């Protein structure tokens, strides 16, 4: 049996990125194509993208991308969100099934605004309030992980090669004025199991 390191390079690393200097939005398929040329620099254990300007219709709201282990955890997290934010829209993040990306958690997206009364009572500015809420979810709700929480941007990450992750998340259906991509070992992606436990 081959062991890790004989099949993949555990310390693989690949990066790519670009920005539209004139602000025009570029289809996400371009960043997927760009990082695919770095395939041999990745190890298949983690890939991700960040797109900026991808949610123009919700550009003034925070876009939370969240992994869940179960629907029970999702419901618990949504109660927390309802207490601390006005939820403008929520949905599963659209994916394209592929045999190259497996064992995915539940993946949801929320467009939210912090409740003004909560910000006032916290005596924090808006960004600090949002950051603390994200940290609270990630540290205190077991089985939930907020992996993206900015305005008019989104992170898309998974266990796999970057080009497969881009296909999985259907990045060809997004447009943004800036894109980054990486391929590497997923050192900070709780919520996604490489192998399903039986």
Region annotations inferred by a language model:
Residues 1-198:
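N-terminal segments that mediate ammonia production and transfer
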């Amino acid at each position: 049996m081959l062991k890790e390191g004989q099949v993949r390079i555990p310390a693989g690393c690949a990066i790519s990125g670009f920005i539209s200097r004139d602000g025009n939005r570029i289809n996400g398929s371009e960043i997927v194509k760009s990082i695919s040329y770095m395939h041999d620099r990745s190890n298949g254990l983690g890939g991700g993208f960040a797109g900026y300007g991808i949610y123009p219709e919700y550009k003034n709201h925070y876009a939370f991308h969240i992994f869940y282990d179960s629907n029970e955890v999702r419901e618990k997290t949504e109660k927390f969100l309802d207490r601390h934010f006005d939820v403008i829209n929520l949905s599963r993040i659209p994916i394209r099934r592929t045999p190259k990306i497996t064992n995915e958690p539940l993946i949801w997206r929320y467009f939210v605004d912090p409740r003004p009364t909560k910000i006032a009572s916290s005596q924090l500015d808006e960004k600090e309030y949002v950051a603390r809420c994200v940290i609270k979810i990630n540290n205190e709700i077991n089985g939930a992980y907020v992996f993206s929480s900015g305005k008019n941007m989104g992170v898309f990450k998974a266990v796999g090669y970057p080009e497969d992750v881009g296909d999985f998340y259907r990045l060809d259906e997004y447009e943004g004025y800036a894109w980054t991509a990486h391929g590497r070992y997923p050192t900070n992606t709780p919520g996604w199991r490489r192998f399903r436990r039986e």
